[in-house]
From Swiss-Prot:
<dbReference type="Pfam" id="PF01135">
    <property type="entry name" value="PCMT"/>
</dbReference>
<dbReference type="InterPro" id="IPR029063">
    <property type="entry name" value="SAM-dependent_MTases_sf"/>
</dbReference>
<dbReference type="GO" id="GO:0005737">
    <property type="term" value="C:cytoplasm"/>
</dbReference>
<dbReference type="GO" id="GO:0004719">
    <property type="term" value="F:protein-L-isoaspartate (D-aspartate) O-methyltransferase activity"/>
</dbReference>
<dbReference type="GO" id="GO:0036211">
    <property type="term" value="P:protein modification process"/>
</dbReference>
<protein>
    <recommendedName>
        <fullName>Protein-L-isoaspartate O-methyltransferase</fullName>
        <ecNumber>2.1.1.77</ecNumber>
    </recommendedName>
</protein>
<comment type="function">
    <text>Catalyzes the methyl esterification of L-isoaspartyl residues in peptides and proteins that result from spontaneous decomposition of normal L-aspartyl and L-asparaginyl residues. It plays a role in the repair and/or degradation of damaged proteins.</text>
</comment>
<dbReference type="InterPro" id="IPR000682">
    <property type="entry name" value="PCMT"/>
</dbReference>
<feature type="active site">
    <location>
        <position position="67"/>
    </location>
</feature>
<dbReference type="GO" id="GO:0032259">
    <property type="term" value="P:methylation"/>
</dbReference>
<dbReference type="GO" id="GO:0030091">
    <property type="term" value="P:protein repair"/>
</dbReference>
<comment type="similarity">
    <text>Belongs to the methyltransferase superfamily. L-isoaspartyl/D-aspartyl protein methyltransferase family.</text>
</comment>
<keyword id="KW-0949">S-adenosyl-L-methionine</keyword>
<keyword id="KW-0489">Methyltransferase</keyword>
<keyword id="KW-0808">Transferase</keyword>
<keyword id="KW-0963">Cytoplasm</keyword>
Length: 217
């Protein structure tokens, strides 16, 4: 198959993925357009490329996964609900770089933190061909956020915590939103909105993420 045919096939698969997301209830057209724009197959292992546009999480090494497309779209939708713009975004758990690429089409800046150095290197290699000038990758402990770049209008956490790290709440700008999966065996999405020094929490659907761990590797 030629490169052009391969790209055409991937484009059709991506369009089917987006239509499936719409059928599953995703209504944020901006999020859907971002998902359509970013080639997910570039972020998965070559042997799993045939599953790149399935609605499933896939292993990316180091006991980590690339989130299923529905969850990526849903978390972005919740951050943007009410016509809100993402602004400056902090992503905790960069993984293979896919979600940072999607966020880059909707945000002014994306700071993506990853605690596992070889995985961060993989994300950097995956993102390089896309030439995204507003994405910055950082090897750091995600539970501590990224204080040197704070505050952030949006924070998105791609790992499940037992509770919301105070550091992340402190780095949220007034009027900002934080989306994070919370729980152990049973997890759910939690949306936190900052109003001055008050943090309002809203719970959403059940999800399954790898755990949020402290430290770096």
């Amino acid at each position: 198959m030629s490169g052009r045919q391969d790209a055409s096939h991937a484009g059709r698969a991506r369009a089917r993925m987006v239509e499936r997301l719409r059928a599953q209830g995703i209504q944020d057209e901006g999020a859907l357009a971002a998902m359509m724009q970013v080639p997910r197959h570039l972020f998965v292992e070559e042997g799993l490329a045939y599953s790149a546009y399935d609605d499933t999480a896939l292993p990316i090494g180091f006991q980590q996964t690339i989130s299923q497309p529905y969850v990526v779209a849903r978390m972005i939708e919740l951050l943007r609900s009410g016509g809100r713009q993402l602004g400056r975004v902090l992503e905790i758990g960069a993984g293979c770089g896919y979600q940072a690429a999607v966020l880059s089409t909707l945000a002014t800046e994306v700071y993506a933190v990853e605690r596992i150095r070889p995985l961060l290197d993989k994300a950097r290699a995956n993102l390089r061909p896309l030439r995204l000038p507003n994405v910055r990758l950082k090897h750091a402990d995600g539970t501590l956020g990224l204080p040197e770049a704070a505050p952030f209008e949006s924070i998105i956490v791609a790992a499940a915590a037992g509770g919301v790290p105070n550091a992340l709440k402190e780095q949220l700008a007034p009027g900002g939103r934080l989306i994070i999966p919370v729980g152990g065996g049973e997890q759910r999405l939690l949306l936190i909105e900052r109003q001055g020094n008050v943090f309002r929490e809203s719970g959403y659907e059940a999800v399954r993420f790898v755990p949020l761990l402290a430290g770096t590797e």
